[in-house]
Amino acid sequence: MKLNTLSPAAGAKHAAKRVGRGIGSGLGKTAGRGHKGQKSRSGGSIRPGFEGGQMPLKQRLPKFGFTSRKSLVSGEVRLNEIAKVDGDVVTIETLKQAGLLVNTVKFAKVVLSGEISRSVTVQGLRVTKGARAAIEAAGGKIEE
């Protein structure tokens, strides 16, 4: 088998519909669009969510809530991800360098998910009760 001899299995590919190419094709003249009307014209499609002038569902329902600006600069790190970070000290900067947090994050919290077997020192991160217990059980410590 060579790359230049690869081809799809027989019947795996369907030929494209050639519309507007004569009566015999079954898709001649109107090309399967029917007669007249908005959808028969070129560019004649309605936008998603348009309900013919009736107030759309999106606008009939009330607005609610907001996006907290703090959530845009906060991150969450799991215990098993911390185990992948090189070095013994875990800070926001080391997490960003390891690719576990995006650069816009200013605050992060360590949550209990997975396990950690080596001892690490967590600096400047908030830690949940379960994660704190797991880190200390592995011989690590937390510095606020």
Curated annotation (Swiss-Prot):
Q: Which Gene3D superfamilies match?
A: 3.100.10.10
Molecular function GO labels? rRNA binding; structural constituent of ribosome
Keyword Ribosomal protein (UniProt): yes
Q: Where is this region: Disordered?
A: 1-58
Q: Which InterPro entries match?
A: Ribosomal_uL15, Ribosomal_uL15/eL18, Ribosomal_uL15/eL18_sf, Ribosomal_uL15_bac-type, Ribosomal_uL15_CS
| Alphabetical UniProt keywords | Ribonucleoprotein, Ribosomal protein, RNA-binding, rRNA-binding
- Which function does this protein serve? Binds to the 23S rRNA.
Subunit structure of this chain's protein: Part of the 50S ribosomal subunit.
**What is the protein name given in its UniProt record?**
Large ribosomal subunit protein uL15
